[in-house]
Amino acid sequence: MKLLPRLRLPYLFTVFGLLLTLGSCVETVENQQIVYFNNFSNLNLEGFENGKLFIWRNDTIAGYYHNEEVSVNVKDLPAHNFVKITAEILIHDSWDGNPDDGISGPDFWYLGYDRTELFRTTFSNSPCESTYCLYQSYPNEFFRVNRPKTGAIQTNLPGLCIFGAFANYTTRYQVEKLIEHSNPDIKIYMGAELIQENSPDPICDESWSIASIKVEAIQTNRK
């Protein structure tokens, strides 16, 4: 039988001390609370800039938007060092994703807070077959190549306008982002930069809306 080498006592104490140090550095959540939630069912747009509502499939949602930006101001947050933003959005009709042809794309959607753009991506509602597929970047930032509807939570909804009579032309996504933040107020904004030069009615061709938005304040044990 092969014996293991004898470890010196000082070495054991060094390893044990290192493990204790690492263990004490683990960041844990001390408090997490929802400070803002809106699914627009109560028609409340308090704190919104460019807020507007419409009813779609018997549900009240914010929108619909084209090349527009919308924001919500959330004030008097409790003590925190992180904020988690969760936005459920709907991508309507003929979004073309990544193609950069100056006629139909790229079709950008972005999310930010205060004066910082946090996330910029593209979405595509294109069919995807061996001979034709317009790729998107989501769930990654632009530029990445992913199949249309990658990361979606619902894909079989009908379009809103130009493809309103056809299934699979509205796609629902839940976008989640965690940011370091400690100020008592936060302004969250989202918007789109869409290109559709060959359409007489661009907003009917491509639009987006917001089904819900949630903001959570998180306090960890970080000093």
Where do the PLM segments sit?
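Extracellular/luminal beta-rich ligand-recognition
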Residues: 116-157
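Short beta-strands within extracellular/lumenal beta-sheet-rich domains
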Residues: 64-86, 105-109, 169-177, 208-211
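Terminal, low-complexity interaction segments
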Residues: 144-222
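Bacterial N-terminal signal peptides that target proteins for export
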Residues: 2-13
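Extracellular carbohydrate-recognition regions
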Residues: 26-52, 116-131, 220-223
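Short edge-strand/loop segments of extracellular domains
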Residues: 101-118, 212-214
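C-terminal motif of bacterial Sec signal peptides marking the signal peptidase cleavage site
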Residues: 21-24
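Extended, low-complexity, turn-rich repeat/linker tracts enriched in Gly/Pro/Ser/Thr and Asp/Glu
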Residues: 90-105, 127-131, 196-200
